[in-house]
């Protein structure tokens, strides 16, 4: 077939990509951790996290999941906004060989129940702000392990405690909830899971590009939300495609580690998720925006340091 569109590509945009550059998405993560080490990966509320910290935290959480008896291929739901725990959890899920099920934190109980049942998720990592929604439906799902994150978990010992206190007691953003406890369901705090995982051995899991990385659910605008099966190859290809089209702009940056991307789009959406992985591949960093609907704080965040990429959608 004559690819007539290629003549319209800019001169420095490649015509082809090769997803086989990586053996899996986990391979991409591993190389990022090895190559970028002490470079910053993200900043949230002025708390920076390096690639090395992301490596250590995600390995600890992955080890904790493995110690709970989860097997490769099991589905783990991730119900978090754009906070540092998101990348840690996502990397832990992938590195341990599980399938990541991204969940919109603003889902209603009905929507959440459908997605958890349809995906067959056996574990969930959720911000406590939204645990009241989970409490309404958890007994109708296959969830056996709930990891409860608090807003300040990864924001430092002093500032983090203050943020969690403010969110709970001043802003009153954590509605009351009660989750069942027993043999069939365990509740663990995010910080406790990390602490326990640091004492356990992490077992690397062989993976290929054809393994399932994500069950990424559609918006549900025309009916029930449907889980799109995304393999490691799908995500790697998306990352390389995005990088190819950003190449003309990125070539003007002498040091990609200084490239600052604004992560205001929800990371549980595939577009923002792809750009998160692109940052990892390049060694650049993300400015995490937990609540972009708060425009005053959003603008304040944008003013704090120069940014180079602001992904958005026209809706």
Regions found by a protein language model. Give the residues of each.
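AMP-dependent adenylate-forming
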Residues: 3-10, 27-50
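Conserved AMP-binding A3 loop
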Residues: 50-52, 213-240
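Conserved AMP-binding/adenylation subdomain of ANL enzymes
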Residues: 236-260, 268-311
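A short helix-loop-beta submotif of the ANL/AMP-binding
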Residues: 75, 81-101, 105-109, 117-123, ...
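Conserved pre-ATP/AMP-binding loop-to-beta segment of ANL
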Residues: 172-174, 179-217, 224, 249-260
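Structural core segment of the AMP-binding/adenylate-forming
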Residues: 67-68, 95-192
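Conserved AMP-binding/adenylate-forming core of the ANL superfamily
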Residues: 20-21, 40-83, 87-91, 108-113
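Adenylate-forming
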Residues: 81, 126-136, 149-157, 265, ...
């Amino acid at each position: 077939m004559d690819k007539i569109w290629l003549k319209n590509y800019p001169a420095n945009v490649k015509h082809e990509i090769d997803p086989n550059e990586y053996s899996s998405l986990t391979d991409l993560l591993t190389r990022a951790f090895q190559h970028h080490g002490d470079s910053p990966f993200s900043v949230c509320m002025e708390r920076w996290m390096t690639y090395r910290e992301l490596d250590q935290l995600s390995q600890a959480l992955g080890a904790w999941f493995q110690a709970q008896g989860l097997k490769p291929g099991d589905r783990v739901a991730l119900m978090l906004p754009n906070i540092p725990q998101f990348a840690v959890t996502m990397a832990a899920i992938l590195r341990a060989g599980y399938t990541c099920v991204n969940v919109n934190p603003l889902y209603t109980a009905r929507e959440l129940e459908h997605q958890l049942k349809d995906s067959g998720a056996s574990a969930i990592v959720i911000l406590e702000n939204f645990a009241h929604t989970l409490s309404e439906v958890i007994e109708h799902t296959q969830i056996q392990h709930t990891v409860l994150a608090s807003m300040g978990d990864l924001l430092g010992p002093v500032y983090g405690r203050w943020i969690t206190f403010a969110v709970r007691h001043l802003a009153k953003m954590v509605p009351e909830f009660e989750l069942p406890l027993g043999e069939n369901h365990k509740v663990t705090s995010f910080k406790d899971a990390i602490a326990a995982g640091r004492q356990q051995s992490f077992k690397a899991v062989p993976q290929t590009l054809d393994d399932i990385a994500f069950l990424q659910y559609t918006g549900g605008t025309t009916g029930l939300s449907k889980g799109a099966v995304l393999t490691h190859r799908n995500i790697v290809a998306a990352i390389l495609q995005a990088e190819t089209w950003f190449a003309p702009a990125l070539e003007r940056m002498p040091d990609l580690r200084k490239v600052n991307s604004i992560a205001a789009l929800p990371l549980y959406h595939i577009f923002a998720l792809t750009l998160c992985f692109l940052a990892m591949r390049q060694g650049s960093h993300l400015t995490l925006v937990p609540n972009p609907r708060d425009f005053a704080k959003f603008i304040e965040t944008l003013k704090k340091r120069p940014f180079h990429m602001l992904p958005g959608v026209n809706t």
